[in-house]
């Protein structure tokens, strides 16, 4: 019996060549609408789907393949006698290949100002149904959803006279991944439309961006996946201009650096190691900001990731060139800057669009057996919630450094303490099990620079010992959430040393 293939694709890339090769191998081609027209125009013998169903396409093409003559031919078990008798009784011919890719829903909803009705019209019904039917019956039917697989199918047909079962099974798995991702994208789009934040079932889909050399450690395997419609302001959407592929740790650190530098409108530079900032600086120019970030901790920046929120010019590139860095992230690089930095073979240069609207996204953490989902911590300082709780108020300079330090400390692993002075971090205490321990680390790092500095804490002081440690180091102002049952002890201690202290009313734990 002559083998038959249904071909109906929105992505026409490679389809004419593939269809011609199938036809040359004796496969009868059945097609629909635009695909049929393209194939016929290129001389491919093709049968209209209506000639198989004996029913016209209706409802503007919404119904054309949803017919027993199609799905009976796809789902029949070939060595089941009853199935074969039923096919013969209803004059249904088996179908051996389904070559389908789906309406461009993703591309449609990515367009600016797309309407709901425009999006809905790009929800494919017949395509996924045929693909799923073929994939379910992959013991007998070859389902092809990816143009990248056309060559493999032809190669095996020529070599073996059939597509091997193991290949059909792999293609079936790809089909179900593809249709599941397609449905998940539609579900997410409509969920966003109706405003459900935490639905009873959460459908998420990601596309493999790259295989990674290894994971967090060399003995771990890893890959990097991105959202189909990832934010332009993201590491997933970053453009790499130079250097070898990003590693697992590179991606994590680059993401952390990008989130921190996004806190600032003024020129800002951030250096990150192991997802914690080792130096952050702001200034009137990006060169000044970077110099501050470097001086914050010139030891830890070695082998780190630097993110800048201004273009890298020749002067800035010369500074960066003198330091061993894994990655530099910026909105852009001048030609002169690229000429300087690309002399270093291993440095990765990334650009990210800083001008786009930064939409709030769910923050997802994988735990064994499930996911934790929360909204992003995008809270910024609100004058309405700031409260000076000490006898002395911060000076104008202290206010500037307090708000700077508060923007940084929310991105440091808890328990977190940040010391800042003159628009730069001078001490970072990260990831400690007690708060005074984090303060001591930050103070030790700051050294003599702690005199006249300010301190930011991501959570309240359970006791007054952190204020005591800060006072002994010469800190003059503190910003913290407040909310401890022993707040009064900390306030009294601050008053004792003439320290100005501000409560924000907002905690910034980060795990």
Curated annotation (Swiss-Prot):
InterPro entries: AICAR_Tfase_dup_dom_sf, Cytidine_deaminase-like, MGS-like_dom, MGS-like_dom_sf, PurH-like. It catalyses: (6R)-10-formyltetrahydrofolate + 5-amino-1-(5-phospho-beta-D-ribosyl)imidazole-4-carboxamide = 5-formamido-1-(5-phospho-D-ribosyl)imidazole-4-carboxamide + (6S)-5,6,7,8-tetrahydrofolate; IMP + H2O = 5-formamido-1-(5-phospho-D-ribosyl)imidazole-4-carboxamide. One of its GO terms (biological process) is 'de novo' IMP biosynthetic process. Keywords: Hydrolase, Multifunctional enzyme, Purine biosynthesis, Transferase. It holds the Pfam family MGS. Residues 1-145 form the MGS-like domain. GO terms for cellular component: cytosol. Pathway: Purine metabolism; IMP biosynthesis via de novo pathway; 5-formamido-1-(5-phospho-D-ribosyl)imidazole-4-carboxamide from 5-amino-1-(5-phospho-D-ribosyl)imidazole-4-carboxamide (10-formyl THF route): step 1/1; Purine metabolism; IMP biosynthesis via de novo pathway; IMP from 5-formamido-1-(5-phospho-D-ribosyl)imidazole-4-carboxamide: step 1/1. GO terms for molecular function: IMP cyclohydrolase activity; phosphoribosylaminoimidazolecarboxamide formyltransferase activity. Its EC number is 2.1.2.3, 3.5.4.10. Belongs to the PurH family. PANTHER family: BIFUNCTIONAL PURINE BIOSYNTHESIS PROTEIN ATIC (PTHR11692:SF0), BIFUNCTIONAL PURINE BIOSYNTHESIS PROTEIN PURH (PTHR11692). The IMP cyclohydrolase activity resides in the N-terminal region. This is Bifunctional purine biosynthesis protein PurH. It comes from Anoxybacillus flavithermus (strain DSM 21510 / WK1). The gene is purH.
